[in-house]
Swiss-Prot record:
Primary site of residence: secreted
Keyword Glycoprotein: yes
Hydrolase among keywords: no
Subcellular location: Secreted
Glycosylation sites recorded in the entry for this protein: 32, 77, 293
UniProt function note: May be a cell surface adhesion protein.
Signal peptide start and end residues: 1-25
Protein name as it appears in the record: Fasciclin-like arabinogalactan protein 18
Family listed: Belongs to the fasciclin-like AGP family.
Organism domain of life: Eukaryota
Record key words, sorted: Glycoprotein, Proteoglycan, Repeat, Secreted, Signal
Length: 462
């Protein structure tokens, strides 16, 4: 017989306790799944999107980081250092801001924003003291670190790196908090990417190298100026016959071109970069699909760029590509011919094209579909290509510009202008009139006189 405690058996108490533990574990597991799969309305991310830091929230959306931050909040608390709006609007270098907003620099923008977020909760009361030095925290960015400290002699003013915390614990939520800071924190890797892109180091050509020179005395390559010369008074290297013989008639070799063995231009990487930019930018998936899957134009463009050519691509958006009929695409080689007409072997930006049409009125650009040219003119404050129903406006400027490839978005598919066949009219000569021979004047008078008296039958010619 089981022992009883206050009228209940020990076995009954044990099973009741076991079931309570299982129910608690199931409830906690269900709570974790819900927390990681769906963000609560009281989340710090929702607070950021609805806060005064509108510029930072807009950059987070443009960088496509909402899903990444939702996953981070589902795993742990986060601390966000949010720059004030004025720091992003007026204090930031316009060229640097333009660099961040270009679709091709999405990774740099993501690294910049993630370096403002620490994957743990750090409140203002957890700041190190003035005499304890700086405390290092790893951010969500790629190997980016933030140092927290207090400025000495300023009554405990808090610092993150070298930026002052202007609003400590500005927004606090159960899954994180937001501190307001005075300026943007720029990682060194992002600054190097900006400097490299601004100086065009990754795509600029190297200095040409001269052809090797041959010493006629030795029939060998000349050594550099720093090499040790033959001392004076030493015997000649070659016999006198070889020294007096005429040297080889060699023309100087050309300097190595862009498509040489050094591969100064990586055309394949640049074409792949601009196609990825089209996909991330949105609205040009059909154009990217034709370049990569339906044709081999991506490979051809990469080869051209590697050889030193520059290209400008007039990219029709998906809406324009959807208007193409089956007959226009079913002919052999039709997609290639259509795309060739949209590629200009020049480097043009929206500004350069607009300035040209404003200055010259109408401009014609060569295309890869030789000998057809695409015409451009100024219309409605923009650049209009083509004419009539087959025209298109430049409405999405400078989607991708890297100094070698320029992509400009247009709202229509261009076709070469069909020249009307001129009907050749054969020149007709003047109509020759047959002049009847006139009878003599005397004969006419005689016939008329004989006719008056009824004797005209006497002359057979009357």
């Amino acid at each position: 017989m089981d022992r009883c405690i206050y009228g209940c058996s020990v076995i009954t108490i044990f099973f009741s306790f076991f079931f309570l533990l299982n129910a608690s574990a199931l409830e906690s597991g269900h709570h974790n799944i819900t927390g990681s799969g769906q963000i609560n309305s009281n989340s710090v991310l929702v607070a950021l999107l609805d806060s005064r830091y509108t510029e930072l929230a807009e950059l987070v959306e443009k960088a496509l980081l909402l899903q990444t931050l939702e996953d981070a909040v589902g795993r742990h608390n986060i601390t966000i250092f949010a720059p004030r709006n004025e720091a992003l609007e007026r204090d930031l270098d316009p060229d640097f801001k333009r660099f961040l907003l270009q679709p091709g620099n999405l990774k740099s923008l993501q690294t910049l924003l993630l370096s403002h977020i620490i994957p743990k909760r750090v409140g203002s009361n957890q700041w190190p003291e003035e005499n304890s030095g700086r405390v290092k925290h790893v951010t969500l960015g790629h190997d980016q670190v933030l140092h927290l400290s207090k400025l000495k002699g300023t009554n405990g003013k808090r610092l993150v790196n070298s930026a002052v915390i202007t609003r400590p614990d500005d927004l606090t939520r159960p899954d994180g908090l937001i501190h307001g800071i005075e300026r943007l924190l720029i990682p060194r890797s992002v600054q190097e990417d900006f400097n490299r892109r601004r100086n065009l180091r990754s795509i600029s050509a190297v200095l040409p190298e001269g052809a090797p020179e041959i010493d006629p005395r030795t029939n060998r390559l000349k050594k550099s100026a720093t090499a040790v010369s033959v001392p004076a008074g030493s015997p000649p290297v070659l016999p006198i016959e070889s020294a007096m013989a005429p040297g080889p008639s060699l023309a100087p070799a050309p300097a190595p071109g862009p498509g040489g063995a050094h591969k100064h231009f990586n055309g394949d990487a640049q074409v792949k970069d601009f196609i990825h930019t089209l996909l991330h930018y949105g609205g040009y998936n059909e154009m990217a699909d034709i370049l990569v899957n339906l044709t081999s134009l991506a490979t051809e463009m990469g080869r051209l760029v590697s050889e030193g050519y520059v290209l400008t691509v007039l990219a029709p958006n998906d809406e324009a590509m959807g208007k193409l009929t089956t007959d226009q695409l079913s002919e052999p080689g039709a997609p290639e011919q259509i795309m060739y007409y949209h590629i200009i072997p020049e480097y043009q930006t929206e500004e350069s094209m607009y300035n040209s049409v404003r200055r010259f009125g109408k401009v014609k650009y060569e295309t890869l579909r030789f000998p057809h040219k695409v015409g451009a003119k100024e219309a409605d404050g923009s650049v209009k290509f083509g004419s009539g129903d087959r025209s298109a406006y430049l409405f999405d400027p400078d989607i991708y510009t890297d100094g070698r490839i320029s992509v400009q978005g247009i709202d229509g598919v261009l076709f070469p202008e069909e020249k009307e066949e001129e009907t050749v009219k054969k020149p007709t000569g003047p109509v020759k009139k047959v002049v009847q021979p006139r009878r003599g004047k005397l004969l006419e008078v005689a016939c008329s006189m004989l006719g008056a008296i009824g004797k005209d039958s006497y002359l057979s010619r009357c």
